[in-house]
From Swiss-Prot:
EC number: 2.7.12.2
Modified residues (ADP-ribosylarginine): 313
Knockout mutant characteristics: RNAi double mutants MKK4 and MKK5 have a strong abscission defect. RNAi mutant MKK5 shows super-sensitivity to high light stress. Insensitivity to abscisic acid (ABA) in terms of root growth inhibition (e.g. root cell division and elongation) and stomatal response leading to increased water loss under dehydrated conditions. Impaired ABA-mediated increased activity of MPK6.
GO molecular function, one term: MAP kinase kinase activity
Activity modulation: Activated through serine and threonine phosphorylation by MEKK1 and MAPKKK20 in response to abscisic acid (ABA). Inhibited through phosphorylation by GSK3/Shaggy-like kinase ASKs. Inhibited through ADP-Ribosylation by P.syringae HopF2. Activated after high light stress.
Domain Protein kinase: 70-325
SUPFAM superfamilies in the record: Protein kinase-like (PK-like)
Effect ascribed to mutating residue 221 to D: Constitutively active
Originating organism: Arabidopsis thaliana (Mouse-ear cress)
Active-site positions on this chain: 187 (proton acceptor)
Outcome reported for the amino acid change (mutating residue 99 to M): Loss of kinase activity
The protein's name: Mitogen-activated protein kinase kinase 5
Annotated tissue distribution: Expressed higher in stems and leaves than in flowers and roots.
Pfam families: Pkinase
Amino acid sequence: MKPIQSPSGVASPMKNRLRKRPDLSLPLPHRDVALAVPLPLPPPSSSSSAPASSSAISTNISAAKSLSELERVNRIGSGAGGTVYKVIHTPTSRPFALKVIYGNHEDTVRRQICREIEILRSVDHPNVVKCHDMFDHNGEIQVLLEFMDQGSLEGAHIWQEQELADLSRQILSGLAYLHRRHIVHRDIKPSNLLINSAKNVKIADFGVSRILAQTMDPCNSSVGTIAYMSPERINTDLNHGRYDGYAGDVWSLGVSILEFYLGRFPFAVSRQGDWASLMCAICMSQPPEAPATASQEFRHFVSCCLQSDPPKRWSAQQLLQHPFILKATGGPNLRQMLPPPRPLPSAS
């Protein structure tokens, strides 16, 4: 920590004070030079008239949008960490979503976000919301995202299995793509699954939101997010302290899909209940199951997602080949791919 210096022209009352013990001095704290890394600056703007308080963090200048060219239309979502606005890029009249993340973040967090944003900009999949750009404006981090005109799937009730299978296929396609790129979402839930008027479903809120969540007090985290966490993520003792983020994403997907089918949170407690009730329900009870009225394929699909033992869960890529998913495309002899039913007890 640097000592506080008096402003120029103002005499310090301590300046001419005589030292009673000149042979004594306070030890200076050790400073690790490896930590003295300056915050990376954005690339210089091609126009000298650009405002200094707003800059785009981007290496692809042709894809960058100036923040001054974005006109806010209305607020489309908000939470503890920030607000999402629908904006229009005035030169092209193209709509985008602008996520404004509040808070003064430490330099280390900003450096990490700068590195992560380049990864997010390279993500290109029809079932993943595209990250176009990022701005640092007056201390606020603002992320320019693809606009999904129908919003999130939170509160959706999708009881028709054909429609639910197609929706699941799209989510799994995006999730398998992220996993192949070694990206773990860590927050799959209905509010992070967006849909547009063309019925395209896309995964949102990964990457930067994950980094920021790591810097926040866990006591300030959303209970709704806890509701979709896997048991071993909440209680690390369940899997000997090992956490597989890919398997955790699959669990969260399974809870979300079952919630769509039932039209309610699938556990015996409220999704917005207290932490203790949620954690007991998730970690100590049996995983929820699809009702007996559902098809055999769907019941098995949910079971493959919601295995208590993480290694027994199917991967996103494997689930894409599950009979419930293939049924949406009309694949033949799908029941032959399911395990045989349990034998009935003998009458003797």
